[in-house]
């Protein structure tokens, strides 16, 4: 017979989808090298932008989906944003109807791919070769996922490699929402592509590239994650390791309350991202982390002063790390369920 813990975990996974069954989102704005560019509403009218417009705010489902590279029906954009090696690129995520991003569970990852043989405003990207420049998961000490900062209204900033060769590139920034990630096929992928033109005298080229689809599997431990609601469990990022172009002090996280975090990954590479809310915060130094997983997958942790939730226990009343968008009604349902389980 299944344990009470497994029943509660299943209920958590099922209930996590209920309050936002139709609430998804997209990248609504990017700031590249200080210049702001608005994105187009999915399926809406089209204005000049370097962000490739998608047809729906719904997530891409299935790691083998043909739209994994830039999102559903992603269209070539008319603009190419000017950037330099080491430029900062800030992404604003929005939910449907102008609401905040609705999810708070799962990693953020960023890739780049050269627009081979042409400019990005003419490049279809189906055959693009991608290299990873950033990945971030949970905060330090069993805290929240960094995605919580995006749900709180924050933005996310990555730093482009400082030695990257000049040319046109796509920046593929994605959120993988794992509120249903306890079941195979439950992960929701939200990829977004922004077109940039990098100048300068850099000569760096990536030593490893991947394709989308192809870089992930629905059974990868960081995509099908039975411990997604256990903050004490290590997380294994899907996809390739960070590119050889990424190095140095580059991992910070700023939250709504001005908290900061950073992470250092295996091989000395560090994520380049910064999640920023309404209150600016400084940059903290990378910290060593450990974890387990596939070769090439990098565990990460951060240092954010967000309020942490207690780890699940199986003694006494069941406790669980509820997604923050759980309503009182759903929590009451779970409590009633727990009472019933203990009566068995």
Curated annotation (Swiss-Prot):
InterPro entries cross-referenced by the UniProt entry: AA9, AA9_LPMO
Listed EC numbers: 1.14.99.56
Intrachain disulfide bonds: 70-193
Binding site for Cu(2+): 24, 190
Any GO CC annotation of this UniProt entry: extracellular region
Locations listed in the record: Secreted
Catalytic activity annotation: [(1->4)-beta-D-glucosyl]n+m + reduced acceptor + O2 = 4-dehydro-beta-D-glucosyl-[(1->4)-beta-D-glucosyl]n-1 + [(1->4)-beta-D-glucosyl]m + acceptor + H2O
GO biological processes: cellulose catabolic process
Cofactor binding note: Binds 1 copper ion per subunit.
Glycosylation sites: 201, 207, 317
Biotechnology (record note): Lignocellulose is the most abundant polymeric composite on Earth and is a recalcitrant but promising renewable substrate for industrial biotechnology applications. Together with cellobiose dehydrogenases (CDHs) an enzymatic system capable of oxidative cellulose cleavage is formed, which increases the efficiency of cellulases and put LPMOs at focus of biofuel research.
Main location: secreted
CDD domains, sorted: LPMO_AA9 (cd21175)
Keyword presence, Cell membrane: no
GO MF entries: metal ion binding; monooxygenase activity
Cofactor: Cu(2+)
Compositional bias ranges of the Low complexity kind: 259-292
Binding positions (O2): 179
Listed Pfam families: AA9
Top-level taxon of the source organism: Eukaryota
Keyword Metal-binding among UniProt keywords: yes
Signal peptide positions on this chain: 1-23
Polar residues bias: start-end ranges: 311-320
Task of the protein: Lytic polysaccharide monooxygenase (LPMO) that depolymerizes crystalline and amorphous polysaccharides via the oxidation of scissile alpha- or beta-(1-4)-glycosidic bonds, yielding C1 or C4 oxidation products. Catalysis by LPMOs requires the reduction of the active-site copper from Cu(II) to Cu(I) by a reducing agent and H(2)O(2) or O(2) as a cosubstrate.
Protein family membership: Belongs to the polysaccharide monooxygenase AA9 family.
Protein name as it appears in the record: AA9 family lytic polysaccharide monooxygenase D
Organism: Gloeophyllum trabeum (strain ATCC 11539 / FP-39264 / Madison 617)
Organism placement in taxonomy: Eukaryota, Fungi, Dikarya, Basidiomycota, Agaricomycotina
Gene: LPMO9D
């Amino acid at each position: 017979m299944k344990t009470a813990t497994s029943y509660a975990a299943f209920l958590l996974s099922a209930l996590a989808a209920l309050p936002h069954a139709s609430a998804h989102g997209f990248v609504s704005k990017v700031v590249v090298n200080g210049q702001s560019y608005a994105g187009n509403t999915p399926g809406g009218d089209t204005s000049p932008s370097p962000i490739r417009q998608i047809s729906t705010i719904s997530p891409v489902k299935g790691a083998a989906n043909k739209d994994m590279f830039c999102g559903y029906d992603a269209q070539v954009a008319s603009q190419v944003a000017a950037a330099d090696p080491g430029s900062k690129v800030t992404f604003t995520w929005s939910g449907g109807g102008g609401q905040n991003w609705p999810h708070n569970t799962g990693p953020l990852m960023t890739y780049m791919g050269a627009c081979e043989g042409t400019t990005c405003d003419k490049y279809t990207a189906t055959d693009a070769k991608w290299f990873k420049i950033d990945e971030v998961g949970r905060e330090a000490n069993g805290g929240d996922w960094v995605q919580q900062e995006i749900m709180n209204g924050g933005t996310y900033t990555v730093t482009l490699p400082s030695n990257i060769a000049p040319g046109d590139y796509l920046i593929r920034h994605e959120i993988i929402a794992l509120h249903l990630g306890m079941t195979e096929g439950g992960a929701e992928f939200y990829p977004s592509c922004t077109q940039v033109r990098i100048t300068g005298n850099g000569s760096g080229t990536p030593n490893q590239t991947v394709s989308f689809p192809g870089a992930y599997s629905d059974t990868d431990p960081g995509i099908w994650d039975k411990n997604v609601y256990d903050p004490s469990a290590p997380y294994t990022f899907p996809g390739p390791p960070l590119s050889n172009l990424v190095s140095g002090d580059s991992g910070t996280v700023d939250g709504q309350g001005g908290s900061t975090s950073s992470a250092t990954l295996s091989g000395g590479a560090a994520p380049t991202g910064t999640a920023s809310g309404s209150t600016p915060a400084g940059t903290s130094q990378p910290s060593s982390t450990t974890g387990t997983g596939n070769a090439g997958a990098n565990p990460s942790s951060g240092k954010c002063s967000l309020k942490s939730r207690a780890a699940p226990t199986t003694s006494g009343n069941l406790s669980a790390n509820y997604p923050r968008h759980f309503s009182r009604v759903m929590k009451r349902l779970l409590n009633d369920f727990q009472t019933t389980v203990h009566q068995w």
